[in-house]
Amino acid sequence: MENLETPVRILVVDDEPDIRNILHILLSSRGYEVDEAENGLRAVECVRAQPDYDLIILDIMMPGMDGVAACTEIRQHSVAPILFLTAKAQPADMSDAYG
């Protein structure tokens, strides 16, 4: 019998290629369909083109458009859950992420 379920689609956004690669390997090995973006602007472009992601993993600290600005733009096109990935750990950083 053919599996009619569509795979879960995840967008991984990070300016560090090694981080994107690790997440891609881990997630795709578990059956997730993974797209990658190297910065916030590219993430927004991906979501505009395909707003039906099931999850977006978004780095906060990126050159150009950071993760917080990208999140604001993404929210205009998608209701996908966004998981922030960051090395920042201060309470003010969490406040910034939640807007």
Please identify what each model-predicted range represents:
Residues M1-L11:
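Non-catalytic signal-transmission and effector/linker regions of two-component phosphorelay proteins
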Residues M62:
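Receiver (REC) domain active-site loop signature in two-component systems and cognate sites
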Residues A43, I74, D96-Y98:
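Residue preferences within the helical output face of two-component receiver
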Residues R48-P51, E73-A80, A89:
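Conserved phosphotransfer cores of two-component systems
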Residues L11, E36-L55:
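Acidic, metal-coordinating helix/loop segments flanking the phosphotransfer/catalytic sites
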Residues D14, D59, T86:
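Active-site residues of response regulator receiver
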Residues P17-D35:
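Two-component/phosphorelay signaling modules centered on CheY-like receiver
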